[in-house]
Design a protein with these regions (language model features):
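Aromatic-rich, lipid-facing transmembrane alpha helices and their immediate juxtamembrane interface loops
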Residues: 1-295
Length: 295
C-alpha cells in the first residue's frame, strides 16, 4: 500500500485518468478550434500530466483521511488547484529544459507564471478534481477494490509496455525534430547569404553597365571593350552560379520542411499540430512557419 492505494490501484488509476485527460483535451480543442486533434504529448490516447495530477491528489486525500480527518469540498478544491497546478508547472518546465520547447503557453492569459501555468486553468483544475473525487472515482473504485487476478496484471503490464514504447518513440521523434530544425535554420541562413550576394551582384552589374556607357565615349579602344566583355561574362557566370545555389538551397529547405509536415498522424508534424501554442526556445520562427504549412 502507498498512500492508501495498492500497487494495482495506482497503476490502474494512472492509466484511466491519463486516458480521461486525453479525452477532455481532444473534446475541449475540438470545440475551441473546430477540428479533432490528437492532443497528447505521446502518440497514444493518453496525457500523463492528468494521471500524475489526479494521483497526487488521491495520495494526499487518502493520507489526510487516513488520519481520521474528513475533507470538505472546499478543501478538495484548494488541494486540487495546488497539486494539479504544481504537476503542470513541473511538467512544463521539464519539457522545456529537456526539449528546448514550451509545449503549452499561457503567456496571453492573466496571472500566468512564465507561461507554464495560469489562474484560469488552475481554477479549472480545482473544479475537475472535485468532480473526479465526488463522482467518477466512486465508479472507478467499484472495479478496483478487489484483489486483481493474474490476467489483470498481465493486461496492465502489456498496457504499460505500450506506454513505455510510445514514450521512447516520442522522445526519439522530438530529438529528430530538433535536429531537423537545426538543419533548416542552417539552410535558411545560407539561403539568405546567397540571396544577398545575388542581389549585390545584380546591383553592381547594373551600376557598372551605366558607368561603362559613359566611359565608352572616352575609352573607345578595343582593349577596353574586350576587358569590359570579359568582366561582364564573369559577372554573368557568378550570377548564374548564385542562382543555381539558391535554387538548391530552396529545394533543401522544402524537402526538410515536407519531411516534418507530412507526418501528421504519427511523427514530427503531429507534435507541432498537437500543440498549436508551442514555443521553441531556439527556433521560434521556424516553428511558426511550419505551423502555417500544417493549417
Amino acid at each position: 500500500m502507498i498512500c492508501g492505494m495498492t500497487y494495482f490501484q495506482i497503476c490502474l488509476y494512472f492509466l484511466i485518468y491519463s486516458f480521461g485527460g486525453w479525452v477532455v483535451e481532444v473534446i475541449f480543442h475540438a470545440v475551441a478550434l473546430g477540428k479533432v486533434i490528437n492532443r497528447g504529448f505521446l502518440n497514444g490516447p493518453v496525457c500523463p500530466v492528468y494521471g500524475f495530477g489526479v494521483l497526487s491528489v488521491f495520495a494526499l486525500l487518502n493520507t489526510i483521511q487516513g488520519s481520521g480527518r474528513q475533507m470538505s469540498d472546499g478543501m478538495i478544491f484548494v488541494f486540487g488547484i495546488v497539486l494539479a497546478t504544481a504537476v503542470e508547472l513541473v511538467a512544463g518546465w521539464l519539457l522545456d529544459v529537456c526539449f528546448h520547447a514550451r509545449w503549452w503557453d499561457y503567456s496571453d492569459k492573466p496571472f500566468n507564471f512564465h507561461g507554464y501555468i495560469c489562474l484560469e486553468f488552475s481554477l479549472i483544475w480545482g473544479l475537475a478534481i472535485v468532480m473526479v473525487v465526488k463522482i467518477f472515482q466512486k465508479y472507478v473504485e467499484a472495479h478496483a477494490l478487489h484483489t486483481p487476478a493474474t490476467w489483470e496484471w498481465i493486461v496492465i503490464a502489456a498496457l504499460y509496455a505500450v506506454y513505455l514504447t510510445d514514450f521512447i518513440v516520442t522522445v526519439a521523434v522530438i530529438q529528430g525534430l530538433n535536429k531537423k530544425l537545426t538543419r533548416l535554420d542552417k539552410v535558411r541562413s545560407d539561403l539568405r547569404i546567397v540571396s544577398d550576394k545575388l542581389s549585390d551582384t545584380l546591383a553592381t552589374t547594373t551600376i557598372g553597365t551605366a558607368q561603362k556607357v559613359g566611359e565608352g565615349k572616352v575609352q573607345a579602344t578595343l582593349a577596353a571593350a574586350e576587358l569590359r566583355d570579359a568582366t561582364a561574362a564573369q559577372r554573368e557566370k557568378s550570377i548564374e552560379m548564385l542562382r543555381i545555389k539558391r535554387a538548391e538551397l530552396q529545394a533543401q529547405f522544402e524537402e526538410l520542411s515536407s519531411s516534418i509536415t507530412n507526418h501528421t498522424v504519427v511523427g514530427q508534424g503531429r507534435i507541432i499540430k498537437a500543440f498549436p501554442k508551442m514555443q521553441h526556445r531556439d527556433y521560434s520562427e521556424l516553428i511558426q512557419e511550419l505551423k502555417k504549412r500544417l493549417k
